Design a protein with these regions (language model features):
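N-terminal phosphate-binding or glycine-rich loops at protein starts, especially the Walker A/P-loop
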Residues: 1-51
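Glycine-rich beta-alpha junction loops
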Residues: 40-43, 67, 189
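Glycine-rich loop at the start of a catalytic domain that most often binds anionic cofactors/ligands
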Residues: 47-55, 75-78
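Conserved small/polar residues in nucleotide/adenosyl-binding loops
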Residues: 187-193
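Short, structured active-site "lid" loops
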Residues: 51-69
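Structural motif
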Residues: 1-2, 33, 58-59, 82-86, ...
Length: 196
């Protein structure tokens, strides 16, 4: 028997949920062979699921959180393919912001770009990015700022973090973009849906 259960946001990881199911199965049949595997939909738990299933390693890096505070973000590297596995939720996730502070006008994806930058520095050129669980609505502007893009107001200054910066955006520049980005490929991971 294989248990593969997605996380329960803010209360139980995928592995904890799978282990709880395995314990329930063993109460009914102590001899049952149960294998617990992580599962994720692109949000919380994506790094754990993919790194575990692909024999990767976990990395930790301090980045700018959704409210510009320092946070420690965990991501994975699959060394055999120089692939980084990143969760937007780890650097810009809704669980990093208290209920009282949740305001997409003020939250940024800058930390996601910092994670990408760290992985590039470690030799990664392929990226699997889970975009679920975000506390942001800046269109990825913060992430791109961290990678060297300029998002400028009418006076030539960087726009403020968060969706509020989009209102004053006048110009986008690529003068300081990391040159390594030309050799990078991305795949975004989201919950699959079926439209009927």
């Amino acid at each position: 028997i294989v248990t593969a259960i997605d996380s329960f946001k803010g209360s139980m990881t995928s592995m904890e949920a799978g282990q709880a199911a395995a314990e329930g199965i063993h109460r009914v049949d102590v001899d049952a062979e149960v294998i617990v595997r992580p599962l994720a939909d692109g949000g919380e738990g994506t790094v754990e699921a993919l790194v575990s299933g692909m024999n990767g390693t976990l990395q930790k890096v301090q980045v700018t959180g959704p409210l510009s505070e320092p946070v420690i973000c965990e991501y994975g590297i699959i060394e055999s393919t120089k692939t980084a596995v990143i969760e937007m939720a780890g650097a810009a996730g809704i669980t990093l912001v208290s209920d009282e502070e949740r305001n997409p006008l003020n939250t940024t994806t800058y930390g996601v770009g910092e994670v990408i930058r760290d992985a590039i520095d470690k030799g990664c050129r392929r990226f699997l990015v889970g975009i679920g669980g975000s506390a942001t609505n800046d269109g990825g502007v913060g992430m791109l700022q961290a990678l060297g893009y300029g998002f400028l107001d009418k006076d030539g200054n960087q726009v403020p973090f968060g969706a509020k910066g989009l209102k004053v955006l006048e110009q986008i520049t690529d003068t300081y973009v990391l040159p390594e980005l030309k050799a990078v490929s991305y795949t975004h991971l989201t919950l699959p849906t079926k439209l009927e």
